[in-house]
Amino acid sequence: MMSATSLLVMNGPNLSRLGKREPEVYGSLTLDEINRGIAVAFPEVSFEFFQSEHEGALIEKLFEIEGRGGFSGVVLNAGALTHYSIALRDAISAVTMPVVEVHLSNVHKREEFRHKSVISAVCIGVIAGFGVESYHLGVRALLGRGNR
């Protein structure tokens, strides 16, 4: 049975290291564990999960899923690309799907360079600082858009 809603959950550089990298900041769950938790929490949604260390691969994935059609939106943790990738910003701006920017940590309580996001202005919203729940809130935000 085909789900009525399909979402892409996309993660950028270094998020493949979750569970190992700075667990006091990012938590102890791996990215696979986070993805499984999202799928379990929202069984009515068909998810595609994607992670890359490479900016171009993230951009290509956005364009690919838009070209395929059938996706209702994207939950995006761009990692460090959040702070400097004009190319990713332009790609988000170029697609018609809504994108929610999410972060595990509260970036505004961290180093100054993390306070600026170049992608926020082209996303429908930003969720940060709630750990794994940031992803769940991002999914809920996209699902709620159908009620507006």
Curated annotation (Swiss-Prot):
Substrate binds at residues 77, 83, 90, 104-105, 114. Pathway: Metabolic intermediate biosynthesis; chorismate biosynthesis; chorismate from D-erythrose 4-phosphate and phosphoenolpyruvate: step 3/7. Its EC number is 4.2.1.10. It holds the Pfam family DHquinase_II. The record marks 21 as: Transition state stabilizer. Belongs to the type-II 3-dehydroquinase family. This is 3-dehydroquinate dehydratase. It comes from Chlorobaculum tepidum (strain ATCC 49652 / DSM 12025 / NBRC 103806 / TLS) (Chlorobium tepidum).
